[in-house]
């Protein structure tokens, strides 16, 4: 079951949420240091992590699952959020260069169809980052943060899911 987008926005407006956003953004930027000319999609509730790409990528969008609801983003510009079913993504085949999944994979009831759709829209040389609660992590054991909801994953579970979905797993952080 998805966490409501309004509740996620409230979390990321708190002190803990702001620290979380900074730490995750830093990791993402380490992996994706150059996104000039690329099309980037944030899937789930990924908007807290997309702002740095607005000035360099050709296109930055956010897709929020209908079950999660949506919020306007960015607050200081034209809306870049699309709402869709998580297993029927409204994008052409091979149209996304970089895709980040946050607050979605652990909540969906359609995991394998969702991964199949991500595979379909991601370019052959595209890159995917998945942010999920760690099965061994402290945050997966408390419901004080959004990372305490849904299905946590171990590294081996993620590797197996991605391999079964025809993805090549390169990095675990």
Language-model regions: role of each:
Residues 171-173:
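Conserved small/polar residues in nucleotide/adenosyl-binding loops
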Residues 87-99:
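A short acidic, Gly/Pro-enriched loop at the edge of an enzyme's catalytic core
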Residues 34-88:
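Class I SAM-dependent methyltransferase SAM/SAH-binding core
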Residues 1-33:
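Class I SAM-dependent methyltransferase Rossmann-like catalytic core
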Residues 132-150:
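Short, glycine-/aromatic-enriched active-site segment of Class I SAM-dependent methyltransferases
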Residues 112-127:
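A short glycine-rich, Lys/Arg-flanked "PGG" loop and its adjoining helix->strand segment in the class I
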Residues 14, 77-78, 144-148:
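Short glycine-enriched, charge-decorated loop/helix-capping segments at active-site entrances
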Residues 97-110:
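A short SAM/SAH-binding and catalytic strip from SAM-dependent methyltransferases
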């Amino acid at each position: 079951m998805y966490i409501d987008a309004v509740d996620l926005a409230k979390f990321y407006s708190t002190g803990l949420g702001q620290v979380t956003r900074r730490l995750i953004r830093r990791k993402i930027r380490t992996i994706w240091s150059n996104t000039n000319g690329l099309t980037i999609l944030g899937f789930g509730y990924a908007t807290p992590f997309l702002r740095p790409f607005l000035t360099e990528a050709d296109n930055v969008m956010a897709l929020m699952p209908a079950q999660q609801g949506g919020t306007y983003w960015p607050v200081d510009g034209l809306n870049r959020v699309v709402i869709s079913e998580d297993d029927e993504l409204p994008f052409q085949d091979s149209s996304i260069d970089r895709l980040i999944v946050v607050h979605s994979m652990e909540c969906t009831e359609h995991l394998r169809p969702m991964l199949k759709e991500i595979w379909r829209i991601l370019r052959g040389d595209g890159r995917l980052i998945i942010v999920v609660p760690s099965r061994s992590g402290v945050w997966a054991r408390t419901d004080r943060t959004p990372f305490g909801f849904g299905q946590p994953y171990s590294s081996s579970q993620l590797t197996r899911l991605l391999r079964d979905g025809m993805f090549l797993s390169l990095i675990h952080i």
